[in-house]
Amino acid sequence: VLSDEDKTNVKTFWGKIGTHTGEYGGEALERMFLSFPTTKTYFPHFDLSHGSGQIKAHGKKVADALTRAVGHLEDLPGTLSELSDLHAHRLRVDPVNFKLLSHCLLVTLSSHLREDFTPSVHASLDKFLSSVSTVLTSKYR
């Protein structure tokens, strides 16, 4: 459960990402594919080479979904319901992949926004991404 401080940290930090959300989302995806090659199995139709337009486009989709979630921290289940259905029933993504992508996103964000990525912000973002992962895997049961 996100505390009021967590919510403030997440909203404030996410606001500092600005127009880079898509760029950072794509970088996090590419980082995940390189670090955890088994995650590539869900993207057989993608060009997975460095700088791929498909990775960038999907990274933007991921980042846009997270931006929506940041705007609706009080109702993550409602905000992410369609994505949860899609990943559980149609795409059948292994739930562990959400944790892997969350980790790669934290690494990416910390590398770009070092000054703002304090231990407190790190903890809040980790809790936020964990909450998102929990919602996205809720329809698997």
From Swiss-Prot:
One of its GO terms (biological process) is hydrogen peroxide catabolic process. Residues 1-141 form the Globin domain. Heterotetramer of two alpha chains and two beta chains. Heme b binds at H87. The modification Phosphothreonine is found at T8, T108, T134, T137. O2 binds at H58. The modification N6-acetyllysine is found at K16. Involved in oxygen transport from the lung to the various peripheral tissues. SUPFAM superfamilies: Globin-like. Belongs to the globin family. Keywords: Acetylation, Heme, Iron, Metal-binding, Oxygen transport, Phosphoprotein, Transport. The keyword Calcium does not apply. This is Hemoglobin subunit alpha. The modification Phosphotyrosine is found at Y24. GO terms for molecular function: haptoglobin binding; heme binding; metal ion binding; organic acid binding; oxygen binding; oxygen carrier activity; peroxidase activity. The modification N6-succinyllysine is found at K7, K11, K16, K40. The modification Phosphoserine is found at S3, S35, S49, S102, S124, S131, S138.
